[in-house]
Each structure stands twice: as C-alpha cells, then as structure tokens.
Amino acid sequence: MKPKILFIMHMPPPVHGASMVGQFIHDSELVNSSFDCHYVNLSVATRLEDVGKGGWHKAKGVLKKLMEVRKAVKSVKPDLVYITPNSAGVPFYKDFMTVMMLKMMGQKVVMHFHNKGVETRQDKWLDNWMYKRYFKDVKLILLADALYEDVKKYVKREDVFVCPNAIPAISNANQVTENSDHVPHILWLTNIMKTKGIMEYLSALKILEDKGMKFQADFVGGLTKEMSGDEFDSALSMMGLNECCTYYGPKYGDDKYSFFSQADVFVLPSYTEAFPVSILEAMQFALPVVASNVGGVSAEVEDGVNGFLLGGKQPVMLNTFRPDAHEIADKILLLLSNPNLRYNMGKAGREKFEKEFTLEVFEKRMVEILSNNVKC
C-alpha cells in the first residue's frame, strides 16, 4: 500500500511562484504514482491584488479553510502532511493556526517554504513565541542552502532538506543565437511593485538612455496595490522613458514565452526574493540575468557566469536591501555593449537550467524527500 500524503498547498488562482509549483506537484505523474495523494488548496485569495490583505471576508475564508483541512485530515488519515505555509506577516499568523491544528491532531508535518522573512520578525516577542512552537517537531524544505540563514534560530540543519524550484521544459526555448543586428530588448517579467525594484530600474533605464544607448524595455506583469497604472505611467513620463518602454500587462503561456524569445537581457532588481521562478524561465530561454543577490537567487545566478548579481557576493536575507540604479545600469550596459558576452552567459544559464532546474529533477528530489520523511 502506498503511503498517504495530504498536500496542503497554494494552487492557482492567483498565479505566483508558489502556486505554480503547487500545480506542478498536483499534476506530477511521478508524485501521484509514488504516493496516495490528497490535495487541499491553501489559497484564500483568488486575485493577485488580494494576496496579503486582511478584512472580514478574508477572515471567514481562513476559518472555512481550517475546517476544510480538519475534515481532510480526519477523512484521509495521512501518513504525512505536506504544507506550504508563509514565514512572516499576516499570512504567517493564518498559517500558524493551520500548522498548530495539524500538530494537535497528531500529524507528521513537512513544511515547504517558498518565501522568507523569519529573520525579520524573530526579535518580536510574539513572533518569537509563535516561531518556537511553529517549527517544533517539523521538517523543512527550503529552496536553497542560503535560505537556512533565515530559520537557523529555530531549526536544526539536519531537519532541513533543499529542493529548488523548477519549471516544465519548453520545446522551442533552446535556440541560443548570436544576433547583434537589432535593437536589444530588456525584459521585466514580474508584477509592477516598488518592492521589485521598479523605481530603481526605471532610474537605471534613464541612465542608459542619457548615455545614448538604444534599447527597448518590455514590462510584463500585473499592477498591484503598490503601484497603480497611473503611477507607473506618471513615472515613465517624468523620466522621459515613454518612447523606449512599453507595458503589456500580465501574460501567460505562449504569450509570455514570446517575450522571453525576443528578449536579450532579463532583469529582476528586487528588494527581497526567495527563489524566483521567472529567473528559471529566463535561463531556459538562454537569457543573461541581472538580479539582486537576495534570498536564494545566488543558487540560480552565478555572478559573472550566467548573469550578474546586484549588491555584493553575500546573499541578503533581511528586507533592507535596495538595489543601486547605477549598478543596474552598469551591468545592463555591459551586456548591451557586448553581444558575445550575452550569448556566452545565456548559453551557460541554459546549461545550468537543464542540469539543475527541470521539472524532472524537481520531481525526483521531491519524491525522495517525501519518502524519507514518511519512513522516519
């Protein structure tokens, strides 16, 4: 008889990194053939702009989700519960209730973190009290070795497993070409948020334009409560970037992949990240990456090999990092000015993706980790 696992995880909608990985697990033939799998969608928000928000409607949704989880545990009687909780803020308080309920019901719990933030809250007396109970007698799956720094106060290293994110292979994504005869495209493919470094990035583009560089900056992603469409348009106008910048809104599937196909450089100057899937997508399409050295990004981008890391060699875990516009501009300028460098870095990124970040590699790692935890 196969071990029974109850997966409590985020799945679309809305679409974000954690929900995409949740969908991959849900659809995995290897995972579903290895275990007797049962699923509960942990998501309460159905729209991206509602993620992280509170309110009475959200509170009712949380209580309803708790009852759904409780019912599933009593019905399935799993050998292991896999959950993808949050690490800080209001979402953490919600997930704290779920994890503590699972423990009270005598469940063996594995927590898979797609975010970070414990270190930013561990000095708060309430959060510290909750973390001590949250992390007691559980196993953790982290996205990168560097992210252990975020939880080391509460979790022993031997209780931690590492399983990086992955994405499905796209058949037409391996076309690495040396093309220097067109205006290069710089791709931003994430939500339009100040915490993604949007203002610093626009300042960097202004620096490049003032230097006389020719480029087209493509923006693909949803607007959020951090920055409205009017605010974004106003920022472009104020910096005089309307001619070289185009906003396309959120894109999915083949529409999204077409932007990767026509891009020359991928940029993600975030204040904070865990292990962004968008970088893996860029690597698959053989794009050199310019990204902040935060969270587990250094496991994806090797500085000077398949891209450039912003902010120094040491990964930043705290949410205090701010990218420097001049550093962003310098790295992009180096890539725009050197097609051979773009080609070689993109090729290295593609090779790294094929070796470490395909869905097949992820599925095998996940099955191995879950099997080990069912037995222990």
Description of each model-found segment:
Residues 250-251, 258-263:
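Short alpha-helical donor nucleotide-sugar binding micro-motif in glycosyltransferases
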Residues 41-45, 189, 216-231, 249-250:
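Glycosyltransferase donor-sugar binding loop
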Residues 230-251:
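Nucleotide-activated donor-binding/catalytic signature segment of Leloir-type glycosyltransferases, i.e.
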Residues 271:
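Aromatic "clamp/platform" in nucleotide-sugar-dependent glycosyltransferases that forms part
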Residues 132-174:
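Donor nucleotide-sugar binding/catalytic pocket of nucleotide-sugar-dependent glycosyltransferases
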Residues 6-8, 177-206, 217-220:
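Conserved donor-binding/catalytic core segment of Leloir-type glycosyltransferases
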